[in-house]
């Protein structure tokens, strides 16, 4: 006959395994958050949101704030734009998209900075703060991706992609990897946010009520 463990001893074993698993998931979440921040910074900086194809009148590509368009007289690309040079950004929609993606980037970086709070604050509270920041970052990325195509009717984009180009119509151009990555990043941010919320609420209640009750009865 199998001998059952006392309630308190079983609770201690459960508690140890529970904490170990929570820490493992927390380390995984933290690592993924750091990797995700690098990804968001890359898609913010890189000017490869849309670009030319074999059918476009000239070569080039556009990002959130910078772009390069081929010279009609030569094969060289003329590049313009910068995050602080708002006058060179082709359209208001691009400026708006840049703002929201930048906001998402800073929120993700902010959630990484919040890791230092684990040493001085309640663990559950820190997880929840990071979760809300990552949820807000997902919202910023979503708004940026939705607004960005509204600027495709700008003269600079039409010059490269053809006269058929308009709002949410890319003409002869194609979507590049940075834009696709930004769309996928929305889901990544939502998953990280969900994990942080789960970790936060798990920290609020490390032991189930039935184990606590059994322990009290044993005493």
From Swiss-Prot:
It is a multi-pass membrane protein. Pfam families: L_HMGIC_fpl (PF10242). Keywords: Cell membrane, Disease variant, Ion transport, Membrane, Transmembrane, Transmembrane helix, Transport. InterPro entries: LHFPL. It comes from the Eukaryota. Residues 1-24, 120-128, 200-219 are cytoplasmic. Auxiliary subunit of the mechanotransducer (MET) non-specific cation channel complex located at the tips of the shorter stereocilia of cochlear hair cells and that mediates sensory transduction in the auditory system. The MET complex is composed of two dimeric pore-forming ion-conducting transmembrane TMC (TMC1 or TMC2) subunits, and aided by several auxiliary proteins including LHFPL5, TMIE, CIB2/3 and TOMT, and the tip-link PCDH15. Functionally couples PCDH15 to the transduction channel. This is LHFPL tetraspan subfamily member 5 protein. It comes from Mus musculus (Mouse).
